[in-house]
């Protein structure tokens, strides 16, 4: 019985790139190789327009499950490779059609002749291939407008690809082509989604989390580590910086009027994150803010908070409502972790009536009454850094270390 031997990957948005497309293709190939490390027999050939993954006996379903999380892939097809002879093409098309799962009642044939010297024209091939499928199946009909299955045939010199099973990729651009940002990872629903969407634009992420023991627990800290771990499904690794924030928050609570404590806290977070970004050669800061969702996410608040950093602040969720954000969180696997009932530092010393239209002048005046410089320096110096990778990579490295 014929089985799938190849996976053909289509790039999507990458095809709009010009002279630097080779960089995008090379990065995508590198990311795919990393993602498929546990499949040693696979061979990958990345061309200007498409990527060919030769399975060499590896499980196509297991490989497909990994590919769907790689940014830069628009779609991919499971494919069979047959000689460019009519009878071989007909047999291959039938074999591919019979492997399609689900309730299939209709199909159509699509033929692309890259090899123009093939002795039959496209309009001659369609009834030959389609007729062979009809002769060898029951209760199946042709529907050229809305078929259950599209049997794609690509004819080349010497060989042809047969494809039925088309699957969606993650879209976007390959992680690593767009520089690096620092993501403020709070432990809530929003910030992991912001990190995911930032990676989708080809940007590598490192995460900064502020924790305030004993007001926040070790379980809250572990929750954020688990979120960062979940995000490694979409990249090679996530570096997480855990910043001790207790003294900063206690001082804010003591020195700053309660209505401005939330605003000043966010400004301190920005200052500390900018310092870490400088150390780590990041080019921007990403947050999970959604316009108007809470008091610190009004336009006035963002305007006042932004004052303290020269870095671009990326807000991927800015126009989304909560239900849209939750939907993405559920799809990417972070929602169930985010709703664990452990407090983060943003809920510590929460003011009863935070200012929704804070002014820069007032924030600067309140901050001028106390020198926060030393506290900021200590927070940066005492951060804990954890590098997280996919579970399979960690297991592979541990297995390697056991050999020595």
Curated annotation (Swiss-Prot):
InterPro entries: Rossmann-like_a/b/a_fold, ThiI_AANH, ThiI_fer, ThiI_N, THUMP_dom, THUMP_ThiI, tRNA_STrfase, tRNA_sulfurtransferase_ThiI. One of its GO terms (cellular component) is cytosol. SMART domains: THUMP. Keywords: ATP-binding, Cytoplasm, Nucleotide-binding, RNA-binding, Thiamine biosynthesis, Transferase, tRNA-binding. ATP binds at residues 184-185, 209-210, 266, 288, 297. GO terms for biological process: thiamine biosynthetic process; thiamine diphosphate biosynthetic process; thiazole biosynthetic process; tRNA 4-thiouridine biosynthesis. GO terms for molecular function: ATP binding; CCA tRNA nucleotidyltransferase activity; tRNA binding; tRNA-uracil-4 sulfurtransferase activity. It is an enzyme of class 2 (transferase). Its main location: cytoplasm. Pathway: Cofactor biosynthesis; thiamine diphosphate biosynthesis. Its EC number is 2.8.1.4. It catalyses: [ThiI sulfur-carrier protein]-S-sulfanyl-L-cysteine + a uridine in tRNA + 2 reduced [2Fe-2S]-[ferredoxin] + ATP + H(+) = [ThiI sulfur-carrier protein]-L-cysteine + a 4-thiouridine in tRNA + 2 oxidized [2Fe-2S]-[ferredoxin] + AMP + diphosphate; [ThiS sulfur-carrier protein]-C-terminal Gly-Gly-AMP + S-sulfanyl-L-cysteinyl-[cysteine desulfurase] + AH2 = [ThiS sulfur-carrier protein]-C-terminal-Gly-aminoethanethioate + L-cysteinyl-[cysteine desulfurase] + A + AMP + 2 H(+). Residues 61-166 form the THUMP domain. PROSITE patterns: THUMP. It comes from the Bacteria. Coiled coil: none annotated. CDD domains: PPase_ThiI (cd01712), THUMP_ThiI (cd11716). It holds the Pfam family ThiI_fer. It is found in: Cytoplasm. The keyword Electron transport does not apply. Belongs to the ThiI family. PANTHER family: TRNA SULFURTRANSFERASE. HAMAP family: ThiI (MF_00021). Catalyzes the ATP-dependent transfer of a sulfur to tRNA to produce 4-thiouridine in position 8 of tRNAs, which functions as a near-UV photosensor. Also catalyzes the transfer of sulfur to the sulfur carrier protein ThiS, forming ThiS-thiocarboxylate. This is a step in the synthesis of thiazole, in the thiamine biosynthesis pathway. The sulfur is donated as persulfide by IscS. This is Probable tRNA sulfurtransferase. It comes from Bacillus cereus (strain ATCC 10987 / NRS 248).
């Amino acid at each position: 019985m014929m089985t799938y031997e190849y996976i053909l990957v289509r790039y999507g948005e990458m095809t709009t790139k010009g002279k630097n497309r080779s960089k995008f293709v090379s990065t995508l190939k590198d990311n795919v190789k990393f993602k498929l490390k546990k499949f040693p027999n696979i061979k990958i050939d990345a061309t200007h327009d498409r990527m060919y993954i030769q399975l060499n006996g590896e499980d196509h379903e297991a490989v497909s499950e990994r590919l769907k999380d790689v940014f830069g892939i628009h779609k991919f097809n499971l494919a069979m490779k047959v000689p460019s002879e009519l009878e071989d093409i007909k047999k291959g098309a039938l074999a591919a059609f019979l492997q399609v799962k689900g309730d299939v009642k209709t199909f159509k044939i699509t033929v692309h002749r890259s090899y123009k010297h093939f002795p039959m024209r496209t309009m001659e091939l369609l009834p030959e291939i389609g007729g062979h499928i009809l002769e060898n199946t029951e209760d199946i009909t042709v529907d050229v407008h809305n078929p259950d299955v599209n049997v794609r045939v690509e004819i080349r010199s010497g060989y042809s690809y047969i494809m039925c099973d088309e699957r969606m990729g993650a879209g976007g651009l390959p992680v690593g082509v767009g520089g690096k940002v620092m993501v403020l990872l709070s432990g809530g629903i929003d910030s992991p989604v912001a990190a995911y969407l930032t990676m989708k634009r080809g940007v590598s992420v490192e995460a900064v989390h502020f924790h305030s023991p004993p007001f926040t627990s070790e379980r809250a800290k572990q929750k954020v580590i688990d979120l960062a771990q979940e995000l490694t499904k979409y990249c090679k690794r996530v570096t997480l910086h855990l910043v001790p924030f207790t003294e900063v928050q206690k001082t804010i609570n003591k020195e700053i009027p309660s209505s401005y404590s939330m605003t000043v806290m966010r400004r301190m977070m920005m200052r500390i994150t900018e310092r870490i970004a400088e150390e780590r050669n990041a080019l921007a800061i990403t947050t999970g803010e959604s316009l108007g969702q809470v008091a610190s996410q009004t336009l006035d608040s963002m305007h006042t908070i932004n004052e303290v950093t020269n870095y671009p602040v990326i807000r991927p969720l800015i126009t989304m409502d909560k239900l849209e954000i939750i939907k993405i969180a559920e799809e990417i696997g972070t929602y169930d972790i985010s709703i664990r009932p452990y407090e983060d530092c943003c809920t510590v010393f929460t003011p009863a009536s935070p200012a929704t239209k804070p002014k820069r002048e007032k924030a600067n005046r309140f901050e001028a009454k106390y020198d926060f410089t030393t506290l900021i320096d200590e927070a940066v110096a005492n951060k804990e850094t954890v590098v997280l990778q996919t579970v399979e990579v960690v297991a592979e490295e541990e297995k390697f270390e056991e050999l020595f």
